[in-house]
């Protein structure tokens, strides 16, 4: 039974129609990422409507902190996924198995480190972000509970990354749907029925994340594929760990430092008070949904490129990059239309106060047209990662999202006493990053990358 299920889920992306392979692989990723976002979005909707705007601002303001720490681990997981996809494309089953084992041990160790570190640095990070006094206590409460259960998030993302690397994007989707439903039910139960406030939404998120982790690990344990987890044979292959770190560390540094830079962006937002913070929080939740199509296609292009590079199908990998970009642009444009039409109504879902709706709508109208720039960055940076080059995206993104954006924000904050120039810091960084990453993709030497990997 397990064998039949596993064969129907894994996908060999070295054969068949390119656009169909990318589309069929991307759709479950889009749906899965959608339900992933429902975790924090449910939290925001519930606290915004049943607790208050301060609680909504608290949930929104801690996002960059969570992403900065989790982003480091996710970067290392990217390294593991690239290596697994290349070995899978090359039909090197023993290497696939040992890479999965090494990744699991690495995840266990890092989950302990991140749990302790996250709880310890919470108050310092919140003060560094200039979090207002009417928000800081609830922000700290939410963060500490979240980090107490961060292992569930890590093991789910590790497991789903392994499944994506071999072409299975459906199992992670099924588990996310289940856990998102559980999260929603528990949010309402803990907050509305039990009156637990922000502690309730944080606890609901942690429970749901652990459920998705358990289900993912179960699939990896029971499959008959080369990526099966054999608990009695778990070991750390130091040579493979070195490869994972070499490929994943640049992505890890990039994601973590970029997220840290977003902490500083949040600090500029916080200066304008809780109304602007709540409006920005609502915008950021909607922004995460808008990013889903391009992020999903980008992830698909990583797996597609990795498998085809592993099989030495370079021309097919290049065609896949162009197809993925066009697909991401098309879906993003289609999603932008209803967003611009119903912007006030979308913000209303998070909070009904007039000032919050006004600021949230302003951010949506101001920034949404620039989403078409992000498709360039999301697709071509992931293509380079799939080919084994994670350093170039790291350098480009750090230069664009950290150095350039922080200089821009510093200058604008001293010239203008307005939130609009601050908000435009995001698309300004997108533009610089997209131009640079596409130029690097055009100059990428595929044959050299193959020999290196």
Enumerate the predicted regions with their spans.
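Transmembrane helical elements of multi-pass membrane transporters/channels
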Residues: 24-43, 145, 156, 179, ...
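Helix-terminus/linker motif at the lipid-water interface of multi-pass membrane proteins
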Residues: 34, 38-56, 126-133, 189-196, ...
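Small-residue-rich hydrophobic transmembrane alpha-helices
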Residues: 56-116, 153-172, 266, 279-343, ...
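Residue-level signal for short hydrophobic patches within transmembrane helices
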Residues: 15, 19-38, 42, 65-72, ...
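Short runs within selected transmembrane alpha-helices of multi-pass transporters and secretion channels
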Residues: 77, 146-164, 172-180, 201-216, ...
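Small-residue hotspots at the loop-to-helix junctions and early N-terminal turns
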Residues: 53-64, 143, 202, 274-289, ...
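Alpha-helical transmembrane segments of multipass membrane proteins
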Residues: 41-44, 116, 158-162, 184-189, ...
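Short alpha-helical transmembrane segments in multi-pass integral membrane proteins
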Residues: 1-26, 84-151, 193-249, 305-370, ...
